[in-house]
Amino acid sequence: MAKQEDVFKTIVAHAKEYGFVFQSSEIYDGLSAVYDYGQNGVELKNNIKRYWWEAMTMLHDNIVGIDSAIFMHPTIWKASGHVDAFNDPLIDNRDSKKRYRADVLIEDEIAKIDDKINKEVAKAAKRFGDAFDEAQFRATNARVLEHQKKRDELHQRFSDAMNANDLNELKQIILDYEIVDPISGTKNWTDVRQFNLMFKTEMGSTADGAMDVYLRPETAQGIFVNYLNVQKTGRMRIPFGIAQIGKAFRNEIVARQFIFRMREFEQMEMQFFVRPGEEMKWFDYWRATRLKWHKALGLGDAKYRYHDHEKLAHYANAATDIEFEMPFGFKEVEGIHSRTNFDLSQHEKYSGKKIQYFDPELNQSYVPYVIETSIGVDRMFLSVFCSCYEDQDLGNGDRRVVLHFPAALAPVKCAVLPLVKKDGLPEKAREIQHKLRFDFTCQVDEKDSIGKRYRRQDAIGTPFCITVDHQTLEDNTVTLRHRDTMEQERVNADDLEKILAEKVSLNSLLKKLL
């Protein structure tokens, strides 16, 4: 079995070869941790965003959208805490000259211990079969108990250090547990220090009159400072939400794993405003609702899990991540946070403007509490792409690479393929494509043999191929090929719109959420 890192490299190469993701500025040797989306990637990305947007704003009468500016008044970032607290604990290895997040190194060590425990459990389950009692095994096996004790002690020290913001203790943990640099294999570490992640620039026509501004590190603050505008003009009543999709920027020192961690990325965020005291009810609601949204895609329920935060952000009183099993392990794709009334209260304090809501049912005014759902578009893209990629053995030495995208997310919904480039078949193919293109992303592919064209469409995840042959000219029927099964059926060309609408419509996906 190929190593997971080799599988991931193959997936990344496929993304580039078939027009999904390119290294930005590639002809100038690229720019680290910055990527461009190609012709197929932008379609997949837009479909993911549309699925999220409609699940938020169409399925919820009390959620509306905005699009706030990237540049905002610099005092906003002072009020939000980003100027003082938006830092990562970084550590360098003197031998490899590489820089790492200290907390991630320790989290990876905890994950390694978890893997050892799980391997012991898996071996025992295989040995004992149906008679295996996992709970009893975990509670009594000496090796498992030894690993678990080490894991619990490490986890407790790590949690205490993070909550106390104790950088010296973070380094001591790395030394005590003999955590080595993954490249050099050495333990020659520097001290841990904090690094602010915001990009800073200037706005103004002259150097003397310029104002320091920041590229926003998150989209949430654009929602908070527009809370009053939306609430008043939309006559919104608590509880209600504001959704936004937009770019954010972080000067990630440790940017890695392709588009998983980038310096320029896109977020889909929704801030849900609730009564104080009801935040945990709504936190639980959105925690479950967001996981349901992910699982509706059919990528595999076992690939998802919750990860509750040990250390809470400065604004939160509850937080959990939805993690997805990437080729490089379970990683966060979405965060759900109870942000209390921190943000609105801070903006009320720093702006001097009253940011409160009068609740007619309670006959009182208050600063609303906020439940946030925040998902990285690029991470979502990567989770979909990785889970849908398959190098399939068809037998007799034949293989194909296929992307099993959910049909509603596929960049190209159907391809019309004339069997040969003569006898009026290309013209008929164009006629069919022209009818379908108003409702579906549809392309005509004439080059190469029909088999090669099928493989090409499989490689970009096209759910259906429509083959036009000589019989089409006689009775107006075409061959409809299904991507995942490769099965073919004969259908009337006039029925294609109806058939495709049932198979690839986003509505069919959204209805699973009701």
How does the language model describe each region?
Residues 1-514:
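NTP/phosphate- and nucleic-acid-binding module
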